[in-house]
Amino acid sequence: MPLRAAEARPHLRAQGWTSLSKGFQIIGRFSEDIDIRIEPPAALDAKVGKNQTKPAHIQSRSDFYDWLTKTIVIDGITSVARDTSVDNRDLFSAGIRLTYKNVVTPVEGLREGVLLEAGFAKVTPNEPRDISSWAYDYAVQKVEIIDNRAKAVACYDPGYTLVEKLQTISSKYRRQQESGDIPVDFMRHYYDVYRLLQQPSVQAFIGTPEYLKHKDEHFPRADNKNIRENPAFLLTDEKTRALYESAYEAGSALYYQGKPSFREILATLAEWKDRL
């Protein structure tokens, strides 16, 4: 769904799926989540520095998310409520659930509603992009409709997103191996990395001092940032590989522009692992 509040664009920063799909149109999959940074009004005095973790600082961020929940008004949205299930421990990110009246048959594999993941993650460097949706792009060719696209929204650089996707895969793989859970919830990140590796600008970014610096800053100590040695990208264990391939296929309904096979994704990772 498009972000309609174009009048608020100086305060909006798109990242993650929102930036890759709706801003740069690199990936073609659905998501219930909208990853976005909305700058708090100065009057709220929300503390957003990464080292501001005192109880009063955390409370200021909680107050901001509560304010945002009460402030959001979007055509077609019937309710707006906090969803604390995805909240970061220190509330550097938090969930807001948007619900709407569904007029079509629900798609298997998609949760109802939209989860707005608001937070204060790094969103620079970025560039202005118009935010659209597959529904708008289709409908505008058929009938006259209101242009509800958000124009010139600052979208996070895809090269930096690649680093963060690699870290996400690594961390989620490690936790999945510890818990034994079925890994459906993060298989989409393998697809995202595959698509990012097709982009010339991302290819040019890999190996640069900025790329290496972002890896150093973003990977936790528990994860091996050397991709060619990290088991999350090798999947040499046959049972684990089969489990992941099955989980990837189980999410097929998410991909509206088709998708590569999981073997193709792993083959691409094998080609790039020495540079990543």
Task: Give residue spans per PLM region.
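Structured mid-to-C-terminal alpha-helical surface segments
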Residues: 1-12, 22-29, 40-276
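Glycine-rich beta-strand-to-loop/alpha-helix junction loops that act as flexible
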Residues: 14-18
